[in-house]
Regions:
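Basic, glycine/lysine-rich polyanion-binding surfaces/domains
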Residues: 1-222
């Protein structure tokens, strides 16, 4: 793999080559390590009030177990970052932000929360994220979980075990436009989940994919 520094992480930009990786995700299945992304938790009775105040989309439209794409905005309505908001319940949300903006986003959310008094947790250094993407991702993940993965609608999520790895957030989100899942887990589980996915992924021709192909895939998706 070709490794480059990015937002304090050493990240794989490509493995066998961007074109080959791009096409492989479109027709089969690929695995991305995107653990550099930031994860914040908002917990409290005024979680929705805070998020309505700082995000551009309507938080009241999200039901439990669903996710919403949105923007974090400043006091003038200008965009600070884009993010995905996951709703566990009325009083608990997870915000997933871009790696290069973690500190800036966190400080802005903290500042705006002062009048709402919710509990905030920055779990960016404690959580890892793998993106399993492509048409074969469904059959591959099905081998490792105890629920029907195709029953999980787009932009939905569950907290489930993947084999012996506990409480993984399995989300039908991703940037590739080829379908698939994002898997949020504790740092101590990520290497084991990576390995078991490749063990079970042999028959599905699973390949590791770099960040360059992630960008070309999402650009092509539009």
């Amino acid at each position: 793999a070709k490794i480059i520094p990015f937002s304090g992480f050493l990240m794989p930009v490509q493995y066998q080559g961007v074109n080959a990786e791009h096409l492989h995700v479109r027709k089969s299945v690929g695995l991305f390590d995107v653990s550099h992304m930031g994860e914040f938790f908002v917990m409290g009775k005024k979680s929705i009030d805070l998020l309505q105040h700082i995000c551009s989309n309507d938080i009241s439209k999200i039901t439990n177990g669903k996710a919403q794409y949105s923007c974090l905005i400043n006091e003038n309505g200008g965009i600070i970052d884009d993010l995905i908001i996951y709703k566990f319940n009325e009083n608990k949300f997870m915000l997933v932000v871009n790696a290069g903006n973690i500190e800036k986003d966190w400080n802005w959310i903290k500042l705006n929360n002062e009048k709402f008094g919710n509990k905030l947790e920055n779990k960016s250094d404690n959580m890892s994220l793998l993106a399993l993407q492509g048409p074969n991702s469904y059959d591959l993940l099905q081998e490792l979980v105890d629920f029907d993965v195709r029953s999980l609608k787009n932009y939905s999520f569950l907290k489930k075990d993947i084999n012996e790895f506990k409480d993984v957030i399995i989300s039908t989100t991703g940037y590739t436009g080829s379908g698939g899942f994002e898997l949020y887990c504790k740092n101590k589980y990520v290497s084991g989940i990576w390995e078991i996915l490749f063990e079970f992924g042999k028959k599905f021709n699973l390949k590791p994919i770099g960040l360059a192909a992630r960008d070309t895939l999402r650009l092509e998706m539009g």
